């Protein structure tokens, strides 16, 4: 008997994130699913501040996904970044996805899903934010104080005389044997300050919470008029018979002669299947299915699965985890005409979700970007 397909969860844009960082016992920012804003940092992990591999600019933060796995003791966070320079949008080196993990106790985790996850001793997409409406975190306009707190530098910004005197006193008490430790501490502090500068120089999109729904539960409750309108517009512009083509995609692809009569451009068959799948919920901005199958918007390269690189840390295979959907494009906005365009962005992560002991920086995972074959379909 074939194994059941992994469940699929959808991410939808919710309320705008406003106000200061949460506190007073409320959930920490890193336990938040959000689009835009700045990436949050897990305890004991420095925030990632990636730069574009093409132009060198600081990458903008697109999406944060809090995604602990059921059989793992780790908090787990994935952040997707992209270059906001239009010349870089379609370049693979202009996109980054960083995975962070922390062994902090999850018994009282911020999303309130600890008890449920303890009952599920398997890695499942169901573990992604079972109580996703319990939000926390900083918005895209977070203060410099909040940024310093994330980087652990809030104590280093004061220039008061009393603190200077205290520093002098501490230095006078140092022994020569402590010199190496001091040097290492200073180097770490300088590195953190450099990362802070990089983080604050990156463009920032307006931030919104992401709410989560189960694809199986969501089906049948939405009006599909919007999706049907998009498909009809495409049919009129390209002169193709969409109903005939999509019926073939589900009935089988053994009728090449009929397919050719539609005079469809190369890649359209994949595009129509993509549109058919998302038509029930065209406003979805994120699709999550750990270990499942991605939806390609155009035909991927031949033998694509074999080209997905193994985990650079442990050498294990990578599996599909989530993808960014076309509707996200129109929801990414900021000052000075800030924008990023794409068709879909597919993220593959280590199947073991490895995390080295004492790791203090995020691990980079594999990201595959497909450009939109016709961006105006999703405006």
From Swiss-Prot:
Top-level taxonomic group: Eukaryota
Record GO biological process: apoptotic process
Pfam families in UniProt: PDCD2_C
GO cellular-component term (any): cytoplasm
Coiled-coil ranges per UniProt: none
InterPro entries found in the cross-reference section: PDCD2-like_regulator, PDCD2_C
Classification via PANTHER family: PROGRAMMED CELL DEATH PROTEIN 2-LIKE (PTHR46421:SF1)
Name the UniProt record assigns to this protein: Programmed cell death protein 2-like
Provenance organism: Gallus gallus (Chicken)
Record lineage: Eukaryota, Metazoa, Chordata, Craniata, Vertebrata
